[in-house]
């Protein structure tokens, strides 16, 4: 069963020690685990307008999901997700994590709209966004942009 747990520093290190770039987006940046980078990344995500969660399957961290750019006056935020590697993809885990994040954003944080983006070539990510209720609002040379409103989210 997939659960979301607030990510702490130790969980962040455990996740990124095993993280592998998705081949669909890996050409944008090369990732190598570095403890100093993981500490800085964790610290950057400890600000007021962000919430960082570990995606946990049977006690194992298989991804991270975050809400960022939270605007409590406009009731909007952005959602992002990273899964550990290809071994945990195409099994419904990302879909379930995004459903849980949307539910948290809409029901617990009183958001009206959640935005997201996906690299144009990352067809899996784009499919999952649409599956959980997002619709495409535009594209640029690199990304497709999406939004999900409370009434059409899962």
Question: What kind of region is each of these model predictions?
Answer:
Residues 1-14, 18-22, 49-52, 56-154:
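Acyl-donor (CoA/ACP) binding surface of acyl/acetyltransferases
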Residues 23-42:
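Conserved GNAT-fold acetyl-CoA-binding loop/helix
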Residues 43-49:
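Short loop/turn motifs at secondary-structure junctions and domain boundaries
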